[in-house]
């Protein structure tokens, strides 16, 4: 009995250890075609309290005149519409792959003219188009603005946040479905967030182990193709099983990411350094210039001359060095660099020098 209990504990520990390093397919890959689609449209916001586009904004006037014409109101030629209660805006929205006709989604409103504020405005019916030029949604509603702007008669003004932009919650109604290969394709393709040959191979092996040989095939470092059921009713259950399969991804390539502007340095866990010695020291050079006035004696024939007297001081702090033995890891690198009191800028210089010396087994990326 005791022996069986020990065996169970060993199996449980092994299972936990395996799960710790395993990741689900849904966390490291996305199904091709299942994505967000951007929509955009041009419209008019009305009902503004004198904070709309100024007189002379031609595209706003033309849009307003065209809208009135479509509503059966004729605008005489040459007549300028000088209403300051109207603003031309761009309307944007994100349409998910599986949203259907009749559902609603949020939209963002952004002024493109010189409107000061969209507070209190109403967006008139605006078609939203996709990249293919088709209309997928219609938007209309009251604009919610979080910013505010106020000005005084003396020209002073105060602006909080951005009053020239806003949102309309559930302000667009979907009128057409997005074409999706999930419904008609004979196979499903998973695209890895971070392409890696080892990860793609292990992912296909994990799927084949559970779903049967030949079900999945890694076609390159970034994609795995999986055979899909022909019946659409079975695909949801099938994908639900696939995306929860756990496996151990391949180890990431050794990289060092450096942000030269902020001094941020990110080092992956696989970075290894060959034998090298690093010396860290600073030269402080100070140059002081003092103006010196040369005044001639009284009644002399000379003239006053101003010259610069320069004094150069060079101070060198105590050089400190540390040795990186072969096979040094991330922990040793950080400890060694910190030991010499290096600043982020010094760390960047040290890492670049190590790579130039051929002692750094990693890809150095400066952003």
Swiss-Prot record:
It holds the Pfam family FlgI. Assembles around the rod to form the L-ring and probably protects the motor/basal body from shearing forces during rotation. This is Flagellar P-ring protein. NCBIfam families: PRK05303.1. It is found in: Periplasm; Bacterial flagellum basal body. GO terms for biological process: bacterial-type flagellum-dependent cell motility. PANTHER family: FLAGELLAR P-RING PERIPLASMIC PROTEIN FLGI (PTHR30381), FLAGELLAR P-RING PROTEIN (PTHR30381:SF0). One of its GO terms (molecular function) is structural molecule activity. It comes from Legionella pneumophila (strain Lens). Keywords: Bacterial flagellum, Periplasm, Signal. Its main location: periplasm. The basal body constitutes a major portion of the flagellar organelle and consists of four rings (L,P,S, and M) mounted on a central rod. The gene is flgI.
